[in-house]
């Protein structure tokens, strides 16, 4: 049988390995290279060749043990050299540990990105030749829990968040053989420099003044401060909680929701001129000009029965819908909850693989991990969300 001999240094062999993996050489050749590399490293550790008599000898050879090693070309079965003193450890397995950690991190990343545990297991097996069970992937995701909890409860007192945007996302959770609807309250904070951050989330039993007050107190207990404007839809419980939790703070009613509410009170047919007139009001970024336009519209349409309810609704909610022009430097990104609506859509896209969470803990873990991921994208972005200088 042909013998393969290596005359290269360990560093050179390591370099060959790295390039070999990239070139998809056969597993047999790569196994031979790894085994020879480890043999060379044992010789260097002992400072004596096999059967060599020398005063520099540090230990004795002590056979081998088998160990699996996962690479991009598949799983290799290696013969790992041992020494009598038990202190020798090939550098290959320092890389192995990093490889394993990278593989696990990749599995977690796939999970957070919206890949089911079944698909994660299949992808890992196809890429690495290594079989992992769905239960292993599920248990691995539990490692996210302490990270999510720490992030979810981090202090907010280092910054001021003058602009606070809130919304709720509904999910399904299994409890005692029942499938229940749960509300995930989410808050985005925008700094005076125009940076956006996801500053908190909390899963509760529903949307009411009580649950929103609990959520706001959770934010304040973590150090939320400097709030000047809260942007949200007009859910009664939410608005009441805002008034209760944030005194001397303005509320910006989401203009998108407000327009939608107004238009639901008018006929779909033969109402184009009224619709365009209402939309025109919301193009103003000066509250005084908008107010004048609103008053003219009401004067023109209030006596028409089919528009009377819409006019009353517009008049009643107008001031709240234009608070961003007073407290938000009239910046268009503060006049609606579009930002948090898009965030919810991204969370929904990733969590829909679950459909029904087995318990609230798993829901908190996945949604928290997704929000952490999106939060990192925001804070490391080179672009500000709002440029208040313009």
Curated annotation (Swiss-Prot):
Domain of life: Bacteria
InterPro entries registered for this protein in UniProt: Transposase_mutator (IPR001207)
Keyword presence, Translocase: no
GO biological process terms held by the UniProt record: DNA transposition
GO molecular function, one term: transposase activity
Alphabetical UniProt keywords: DNA recombination, DNA-binding, Plasmid, Transposable element, Transposition
Annotated Pfam families: Transposase_mut
PANTHER family the UniProt entry points to: TRANSPOSASE FOR INSERTION SEQUENCE ELEMENT IS1081
Function: Required for the transposition of the insertion element.
Protein family (similarity comment): Belongs to the transposase mutator family.
Name of protein: Transposase for insertion sequence element IS256 in transposon Tn4001
Native species: Enterococcus faecalis (strain ATCC 700802 / V583)
């Amino acid at each position: 049988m042909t013998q393969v001999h290596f005359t290269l240094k360990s560093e050179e062999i390591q370099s060959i390995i790295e390039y070999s993996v990239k070139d998809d050489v056969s597993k047999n050749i790569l196994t031979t290279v790894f085994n020879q590399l480890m043999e060379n490293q044992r010789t260097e550790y002992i400072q004596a060749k096999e059967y060599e008599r020398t005063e520099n000898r540090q230990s004795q050879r002590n056979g081998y043990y088998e160990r699996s090693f996962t690479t991009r070309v598949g799983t290799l079965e290696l013969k790992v050299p041992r020494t009598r003193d038990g202190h020798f450890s090939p550098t290959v397995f320092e890389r192995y540990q990093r490889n394993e950690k990278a593989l696990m991190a990749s599995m977690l990343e796939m999970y957070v990105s919206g890949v089911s545990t079944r698909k994660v297991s299949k992808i890992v097996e196809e890429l690495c030749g290594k079989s992992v069970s769905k239960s292993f992937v599920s248990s691995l995701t539990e490692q996210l829990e302490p990270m999510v909890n720490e992030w979810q409860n981090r202090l907010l007192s280092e910054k001021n968040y003058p602009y606070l945007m809130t919304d709720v996302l509904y999910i399904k959770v299994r409890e005692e053989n029942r499938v229940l609807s749960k509300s995930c309250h989410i808050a985005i904070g925008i700094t005076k420099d125009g940076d956006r951050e996801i500053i908190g989330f909390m899963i509760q039993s529903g949307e009411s003044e009580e649950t929103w007050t609990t959520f706001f107190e959770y934010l304040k207990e973590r150090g939320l401060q400097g709030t000047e404007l809260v942007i949200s839809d007009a859910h009664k419980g939410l608005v009441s909680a805002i008034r209760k939790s944030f005194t001397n703070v303005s509320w910006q009613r989401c203009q998108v929701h407000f327009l939608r509410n107004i238009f639901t009170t008018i006929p779909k047919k033969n109402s184009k001129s009224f619709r365009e007139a209402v939309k025109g009001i919301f193009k103003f970024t000066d509250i005084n000009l908008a107010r004048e336009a609103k008053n003219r519209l009401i004067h023109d349409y209030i006596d028409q029965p089919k528009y009377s309810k819409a006019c009353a609704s517009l008049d009643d909610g107008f001031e709240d819908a234009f608070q961003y022009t007073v407290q938000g430097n009239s910046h268009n990104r503060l006049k609606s909850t579009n930002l948090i609506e898009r965030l919810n859509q991204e969370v929904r896209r990733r969590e829909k693989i679950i459909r029904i969470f087995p318990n609230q803990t798993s829901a908190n873990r996945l949604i928290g991990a997704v929000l952490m991921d999106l939060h990192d994208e925001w804070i490391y972005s080179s672009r500000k969300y709002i440029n208040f200088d313009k």
